[in-house]
Regions:
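Intrinsically disordered, low-complexity Pro/Gly/Ser/Thr-rich segments with frequent PxxP/GP/PP motifs
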Residues: 246-264, 666-703, 770-796
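Accessory beta-strand-rich segments of carbohydrate-active enzymes
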Residues: 4, 8-18, 41, 67, ...
Length: 821
């Protein structure tokens, strides 16, 4: 078989007025004298090409889209390629965004209108030795105006929900404003030719028997001549073949099973080794491989996950598409995002129902890393048409997603989509739940038929007496706008959000100096009812100023740096308080070992535009204050303080082993600059458990200008966990303004050592570029302690800066590695 990736000789041309659907007119657009753009790489969407040629600026840098003319035009791609004529051939488009006609050598192959589908065409009878492929994209807004829905949906189902497009391009919820509508080819275009045979499709299922043996069931679909030999093998992580089979490509389709005695099991990386096996199909000189794994996932009605019988609490985040400018997959950028997810102790990511379709490479990366995925189908926060033509599209999308992705051990569950029931309750509480037929009939039927071993979950959120009921099913953290009964210890938060700015360096990329600040102090008043400057609001989509953390706990800002700190520290405080409570999992007065909260997925991990929004990793892949607080709160061994009627010291163990050691608790007085009280006590804690180790009752009344400090040490005196808990809100505390911060760099060991003479509130580190990453940042530092920070990845040279929230002194050190001999 021969598989040709059509990744060269591509051209793009924009049209000020539509071109007639005629091959002569279309091919003339790409004559020798054409002013079409030659694509420097492929795939590229229209914005990618225009940016590469300097026609536009990247609207994501400032979060403002000025080039609306792009989505008002038709755009045409052309590719010239060589192939073998007169052999069975299949032309496949893995990503078409969105409304396009496909022409080959003068023949219209068909029209594309669903961005989530791959499009395949039988072209063997049309191919020549030299070929011309043209893909004509119609302006999306023009096509949307042609859509109509039956009268019963009027005012309930928006037109955009009848179109199968990337919805995020049609609103500014998570991108620049006004919205940025993408267009073009965003994934590979391939030509498979049967010489004499080609593998048209491979699907596989894996499961474990009751005896613990592994089964891989493979279905192969062939094109071309029959009776060509093929071989299938399954290799373990070391490359050793543990099962194989062979046959001939008779009748075009075969189903076969491979068995593995007691295979190594796949675990999320926080609880074991994510062991993968490689399934390979060979015919003639070609080979196609898939990663598979063996694991048993059971999920209770309270969404407690058990992986291979082991309870696993899910601590993670929602993953956004990487860039609003393009859906072309960027593996290096995604690798950085996944690195940051693991650095933050995340074992689950949610693939959001309104985000973009991700390629096989993403799922393989999650397989290898041991990151579990909550996988939504592509529905989002809207009611939907239930007409038969629409239901057929949803069915096709679900079938394609399952056939191509179900073999991945990283996928924990399929979910019907994002906020269908919530959209009905919030927007149209008296209306029927249009779209319920999709999530209650279409999707579950497809899942039961194609992937019966994996849980299907109807919608996120759903369950209980109302859609967002925290006490049944999953919930989304809308407590910034709503009072939600039962919110303190929900079963599972599949979203939970607050808004903050990106890092200070990224803010300077976003705004001009005049936008960043006007002289004066910003305070919430009747005449200024917003917590952020008005000039920031055009960079804050979706009314983000209503969704800040507890900024009222912080001093009013007199500079833009102080405002950035105020907003970001409030976001971090929200995570500290909320996730700390969820990790404990039960109220202090409960005499039980039950942990009510089984998972928390922060909304959201990453930003796809440089805006003020929910992401804790900004557009330039810089983690902010809230990210590092999430990292600390997701630590497998986690210490926390509950300030209710008593000050309780808690320890949570989400590892797989029993832990014993010593906990040190002290009070640090900010004004006296000393510890006023100290205690030390032993502890032992089982896996998957939370324990209240003590209260501070024996110290009686405690002055609120003190800080509770907790350090957890194992029996070898190795630090396992630590936390710092103020006794009052920050605007009432007198943090030192001269802390005597010092920093020493050891580039050869990739570390920084920091010390201070007085309590240092929120030590922040940054390099002289955007590439410097630290394993901890935005942390408090006590006098007498040495903080060791790893630099990841370590630059060869540069300058690293450190500063604190209240001391205006900036400390710096040179970073230079010795050259390797």
């Amino acid at each position: 078989m021969s598989c040709i990736c059509l990744d060269t000789n591509w051209f793009l041309k924009g049209l000020e007025s539509p071109c007639p659907p005629d091959w002569t007119a279309l091919s003339a657009l790409f004559s020798e004298n054409s002013d079409a753009f030659s694509l420097p790489r492929f795939p590229m969407q229209v914005h990618d090409v225009l940016l590469a040629y300097g026609i536009i600026e990247n609207p994501n840098i400032r979060g403002v889209n000025r080039d609306l003319w792009i989505h008002e035009r038709d755009w045409v791609y052309c590719c010239r390629f060589s192939a073998q004529a007169n052999v069975p051939s299949l032309l496949t488009f893995d990503g078409v965004d969105t409304f396009a006609d496909v022409w080959l050598n003068g023949t219209l192959l068909g029209s594309c209108s669903d961005v989530y589908l791959s499009w395949e065409y039988d072209v063997g009878h049309l191919l020549r030795t030299e070929n011309t492929l043209i893909v004509y994209f119609h302006a999306a807004q023009t096509e949307l105006k042609k859509l109509s829905l039956p009268e019963r949906y009027a005012g309930l189902v928006p037109t955009i929900s009848a179109a199968r497009v990337f919805r995020t391009g049609y609103h500014d919820y998570c991108g620049p404003s006004p919205c940025l509508i993408r267009c073009g080819l965003y994934a590979p275009v391939t030509l498979r030719q049967a010489e004499p045979v080609a593998l048209a499709e491979i699907t596989c299922d894996t499961w474990l028997t009751e005896d613990g043996d592994g089964v891989v069931q493979v279905q192969l679909t062939w094109m071309g001549q029959a009776d060509t030999p093929y071989a299938v093998s399954l290799a373990d992580a070391h490359g050793t073949v543990v099962a194989d089979a062979s046959g001939k490509t008779a009748h075009g389709r075969q189903r076969l099973s491979l068995s593995v005695h007691q295979p190594e099991r796949w675990y999320p990386w926080t609880h074991g080794t994510p062991t993968c096996y490689t399934l390979t199909v060979r015919a003639e000189k070609e080979a196609v491989s898939r990663l598979v794994g063996f694991r048993q996932i059971d999920i209770s009605d309270r969404l407690l996950f058990r992986v291979n019988g082991m309870p696993v609490r899910m601590w993670g985040a929602n993953l956004m598409h990487l860039d609003t400018l393009t859906n072309c997959y960027a593996p290096e950028k995604m690798a950085r995002i996944l690195d940051l997810a693991q650095l933050a102790n995340c074992n689950m990511l949610r693939v959001w129902g309104e985000a973009d379709k991700l390629p096989e490479a993403f799922y393989e990366e999650c397989d290898r890393r041991g990151i579990l995925l909550w996988q939504d189908f592509f529905l989002g926060c809207s009611l939907y048409s239930e007409e038969e033509d629409q239901l057929s599209l949803y069915r096709q999308e679900a079938e394609m997603l399952l056939r191509t992705r179900k073999h991945h051990p990283c996928i924990a569950l399929w979910c019907g989509g994002n906020e269908l029931y919530l959209a009905q309750e919030y927007q149209h509480p008296e209306a029927p739940v249009y779209g319920e037929k999709i999530i209650r009939e279409v999707f579950p039927e497809v899942c039961a038929r194609l992937d019966p071993h994996r849980l299907y979950y109807p919608s996120s959120p759903c369950g209980g007496s109302f859609a967002n009921d925290p006490q049944c099913g999953d919930t989304h953290g809308y407590t910034h706008l709503w009072f939600v009964p039962g919110r303190a210890y929900p079963h599972f938060l599949s979203e939970n959000c607050r808004v903050s700015t990106p890092t200070w360096q990224s803010m300077n990329q976003m705004m001009t100096p005049d936008e960043l600040w006007e002289e004066g102090t910003y305070a919430l008043t009747a005449h200024h009812p917003c917590e952020i400057p008005e000039s920031w609001m055009k960079h804050t989509p979706n009314e983000g100023w209503l969704k800040l953390g507890p900024v009222e706990h912080y001093r009013d800002a007199e500079t833009p740096q102080e405002m950035v700190y105020r907003v970001c520290a409030a976001h971090a405080e929200y995570i500290h308080e909320q996730v700390g409570r969820f990790r404990r999992g039960r109220a202090p007065w409960e005499n039980s070992d039950i942990r009510h909260t089984n998972g928390h997925l922060l909304w959201r991990l990453n930003e796809n535009s440089n805006v003020i929004s929910f992401g804790v990793v900004d557009y330039f892949l810089q983690p902010g204050h809230a990210y590092y607080e999430m990292k600390r709160c997701y630590a497998p061994v986690f210490a926390s303080v509950a300030l209710d009627d008593h000050a309780g010291i808690y320890l949570t163990n989400d590892t797989t082993r029993t832990i014993a050691g010593t906990v040190e608790v002290s009070l640090f007085h900010l004004v006296k600059n000393e510890r006023t009280h100290q205690m030390e006590l032993p502890f032992t804690i089982e896996p998957d458990a939370t324990a209240r180790l003590c209260t501070l009752d024996e110290w009686g009344q405690i002055r609120k200008e003190q800080i509770i400090c907790v350090r957890v040490l194992d029996k070898r005196r190795t630090l396992l966990a630590e936390t710092i808990q103020p006794l009052d809100i920050e605007r009432r505390l007198a943090y030192p303004q001269q802390v005597g911060l010092s920093m020493i760099a050891s580039a050869d060991t990739d570390t920084l050592l920091l010390r201070c003479e007085h309590y240092a509130r929120c030590v922040s580190l940054h390099g002289d570029g955007f590439d410097t990453l630290f394993d901890d940042n935005f942390f408090d530092l006590l006098p007498g302690e040495t903080k060791c920070i790893r630099v990841l990845p370590s630059p060869s040279s540069g300058v690293i800066y450190a500063e604190t929230a209240y001391d205006q002194t900036i400390v710096s050190c040179q970073w230079k590695k010795e050259k390797e001999k």
